[in-house]
Structure formats: C-alpha cells, structure tokens
C-alpha cells in the first residue's frame, strides 16, 4: 500500500486489469517488488529473530546489545508485515482487510521502518562518542540513557507516522471492482507537500547526515592511528552509509516528486506504477543490517569456526567497543599526565 497514494479518476480505468479480475498478469515493477519482498521476508525474519534472541540475553549488562535489540525489533516487525503488502500487490493493489486495518497496518509498517532508520543513526552517534569522548561515556553512558535514546527514536518515528494514520482511507472502485487503501489529503497540496518535506528531512536527510558525519570522523580517526589502519574499516563505513543511502533514496525521492506533481500528469502516473518497487527496495534495509555487521566484523575463516549465535554475540555485545573506549581513555589520561 503506497504511502503517497492519490485518488483520481485514472485509478478507475486501468487497462491492465480486466473488469472481472480473472487475469493474473502483473506489471513488471510489481513482480520485481514481490520477489524482493519474498527474499527480504525470509532473510529478515530469520536474521532479525536471531539477533533479538542473542541481544535479549545481553541487554541487561551491555549497552551495545540495547541498540541492536531495538534495531532488530524494528526490522523484525517490519518484515512480519510484508505478507500484507504481498497480498495487496498480488490482487492488483486490492485491499481486502477493511478500513480499520487500512489505517493501522500500513502505519505500523511505516513506524517500524522509520524507527529502524532513527535507531541506526543513534547507534552511529553512540559509536562516535565512544571514540571522541570516552571519558564522558565512562562517566555518564549507561543502560538508562540508552533506553531513553531508544524511546526518543521510537517517539520520533511515531510522529512521522501520524499523518499516514490520520489521512489513510479506503475507497471502493467499480471498473475494475476493488478496494484501494491509501493516503488522501483531500486535494490539499500544501499540506501534502509539508508532510512530504518534514518526512524527507527527519526520516532521511537528518539520519543520513548523522551517519555520514559520524563515520567520516571515525574513519579519519582510525586512519590517523597507523596501527589500526586497514581497508576493512573503510569497507564497514562504505557498507553502512551506502546501504542506507541506496535503499531509501528511491522511496524518498519518488514520494517527494509525487507530492509536487498533479495526479493526472504522465510523470506522476509513471512514478505511481513504480511505487511498490521503491517500497520493496527500501525494505531491503530491514534485512541488510545483520548481514553488514556480521560479515564486515569477522573474517571468513572466523565465521566458519564459530556458530552463528556465538558470532552474533561477539559482534553485537559491548566487549570490543568497551575495549576501544578504555584504550582511548588510557591514551587521553596518559597525555594529560605528561602535560602536568
């Protein structure tokens, strides 16, 4: 169910769908979206469920596990909602779940997707502070503050989702006969554009800037220390930032363009046909995070020697981060002692 859905007479005259709905023919973008949804569902549910299981036992004693637990929960819940999108696309975007479900289910999908983005930005900021302000982290960084930061991320994600919940409605069509579920701003283009701009800035630009700035400074700090200079660090940085940018950019750009275009324009109609594919592309980010941190954090031989839960526990817990923080703390203290 596209979040930037517009109702107009063009929806009622779709030449690709017969009146009796007997044809199983789907557009190529919809077929590609279904394939992506299927892969993301299988990988995302299993991968994030494993991460939740591993980090749930560690969250009481390690802050890093709190970050990844919340991130995995957001991605896991997003993946669980995929059969809903899958069913709607298979039925030529017919919505068989009713009006209440039209408001709640797509809004929950958006809530979890934006929570995933904001939590990823929070994790990046935390790693930045660990490296550049380790003394403050040792004095004030605790589980309570981590849970508060996660609550703020979830709260902001909820605010970003409210417009979708308020303006999402169902509409019955007759040629072909089907029910559509989408966002209807009542032809108020200013409100629609304002919602799109706020969502773009808070849900994409700001997290992207946070990721880019944090990992750029972390990369510079790492490369300035000759003992830790390696191409692996560069690959981790490129993977995290590039995956976020690549998978979310089409969804955000098409949504912004559709909010500024007239529903009858050829460009709008083309973007509307690609909307499901853009959503599925953004969904890849829900299953890619566990893969990035596991594959980038360990060598191939190490992955073969360890069981997957054990490997995830080593990657997602606090040990390596704490050691890095303590190392910088000792270095800072030694430097201060030499100056006095």
UniProtKB/Swiss-Prot annotation:
Predominant place of localization: membrane
Keywords noted in UniProt: Cell membrane, Chemotaxis, Cytoplasmic vesicle, Disulfide bond, G-protein coupled receptor, Membrane, Phosphoprotein, Receptor, Sulfation, Transducer, Transmembrane, Transmembrane helix
Modified residues (Phosphoserine): 307, 310, 320, 325, 327, 331
Molecular-function GO terms, alphabetical: complement component C5a receptor activity; G protein-coupled receptor activity
Membrane topology listed for this record: Multi-pass membrane protein
SUPFAM superfamilies in alphabetical order: Family A G protein-coupled receptor-like (SSF81321)
Name of the protein this chain belongs to: C5a anaphylatoxin chemotactic receptor 1
Originating organism: Pongo pygmaeus
Designated gene of the protein: C5AR1
């Amino acid at each position: 169910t596209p979040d930037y859905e517009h109702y107009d007479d063009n929806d009622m005259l779709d030449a690709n769908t017969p009146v009796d709905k007997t044809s199983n023919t789907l557009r190529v973008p919809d077929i590609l979206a279904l394939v992506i949804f299927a892969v993301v569902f299988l990988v995302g549910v299993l991968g994030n469920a494993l991460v939740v299981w591993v980090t749930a036992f560690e969250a009481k004693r390690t802050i890093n596990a709190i970050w990844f637990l919340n991130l995995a929960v957001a991605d896991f819940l997003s993946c669980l909602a995929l059969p809903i999108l899958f069913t709607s696309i298979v039925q030529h975007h017919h919505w068989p779940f009713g009006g209440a479900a039209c408001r709640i289910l797509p809004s929950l999908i958006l809530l979890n997707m934006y929570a995933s983005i904001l939590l990823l930005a929070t994790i990046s900021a935390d790693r930045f502070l660990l490296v550049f302000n380790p003394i403050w982290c040792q004095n004030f960084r605790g589980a309570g503050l981590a849970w508060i930061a996660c609550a703020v991320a979830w709260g902001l994600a909820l605010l970003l989702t409210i417009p979708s919940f308020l303006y999402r409605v169902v509409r019955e069509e007759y040629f072909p006969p089907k029910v559509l579920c989408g966002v209807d701003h009542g032809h108020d283009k200013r409100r629609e554009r304002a919602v799109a701009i706020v969502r773009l800035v808070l849900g994409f630009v700001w997290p992207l800037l946070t990721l880019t700035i944090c990992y750029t400074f972390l990369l510079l700090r790492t490369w300035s220390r000759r003992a830790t200079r390696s191409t692996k660090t560069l690959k981790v940085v490129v993977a995290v930032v590039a995956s976020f940018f690549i998978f979310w950019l089409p969804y955000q750009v098409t949504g912004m363009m559709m909010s500024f275009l007239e529903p009858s324009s050829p460009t709008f109609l083309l973007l509307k046909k690609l909307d499901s594919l853009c959503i599925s592309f953004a969904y890849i980010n829900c299953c890619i995070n566990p893969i990035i941190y596991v594959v980038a954090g360990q060598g191939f031989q190490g992955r073969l020697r360890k069981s997957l839960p054990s490997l995830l526990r080593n990657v997602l817990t606090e040990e390596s981060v704490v050691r890095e923080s303590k190392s910088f703390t000792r270095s800072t203290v030694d430097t201060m002692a030499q100056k006095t």
